[in-house]
Amino acid sequence: MPSPISPLGGWIARWRDRQTEFPHELAVCAIFKNEAPYLAEWLTFHEGIGVDHFYLYNDASEDNFSEVIAPWMARGMITLTDWPVHPQVAAYNDCIRRFRMQARWIAFLDLDEFLFSPTGQQVPDVLTRYRGVSALFVYWVLFGSGGNEVQPDAPVLEAYRRCLDLEGTRADAFDHGKSDDRSNYVTGWSRDGKSIVNPRLVRKQNVHKPKSVWAGPILDENRRPVRQRAVDSPVSYSILRINHYWSKSITELTAKVERGSIANRKRPKRSLERWLARERMLNGSVDETVIPIWRRIAAQADYDQARSK
């Protein structure tokens, strides 16, 4: 295979990208494990904002996820891959390798992340202004528990409305406990996000953004180079954003810490005390930007009726 800086590699990538029609305009790739309680909401929402296919990687789930995703499987909207051994990044790169000619754009998300445009536009319509980039980096908004010890009887998008606002994100100087084993993040963790990539131009994908590309820049929504987690990172999410329901309830956060990292199974178990300290950062402001968008989608999809079955 040509190297990432090879002119031939870039030429091949650009040649592939000359294709003008794709089976899917915007797909999402995600790896999951025992997420059955959340899958229907997540799938419903993303279908509603313009996602027309899902590449899902099942990490040895033991719950009833197959029943939950059955309606989307029946409509041909999900490509399901069993992925019980390899970690998250390997799944992402498998997706690029196998499906680069199937989707114009692929967004890499977790099941607690919800991509949308605050303008109310469909995301594929927004993406038309970013043709030529290898990846569009979308900053996230981090949501806390809102004081909920357990999950309320409501969709995630309705239940959690307290977050770290833009001013707090830009000023974040919380010491996330950098250590040699990388078991905790470093300062600037809130100034992060995920990427929507042109899979023909990306050579290798990491969790948050491409590790290497064949051609094309990696830019944010304002067409600026990405300064991920940097002190002077120009965080902006007025065009596209990701609501990251990082903790959900305190009970769910505790379980998340106990499960460990899906991205790196060799990473030592995280510190619950430090993660609870992080969570306390994320409840200072109320943000309901997504609520009207979600309610419109839920009504159109008859989500409440489907949820009660």
Q: Which residues does each predicted region cover?
A:
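N-proximal low-complexity "stem/linker" segments adjacent to membrane-targeting elements
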Residues: 1-44
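Short, acidic, metal-binding catalytic loop of nucleotide-sugar glycosyltransferases
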Residues: 44-53
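A conserved acidic beta->alpha catalytic loop
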Residues: 58-74
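Active-site nucleotide-sugar/metal-binding loop of Leloir-type enzymes
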Residues: 93-105
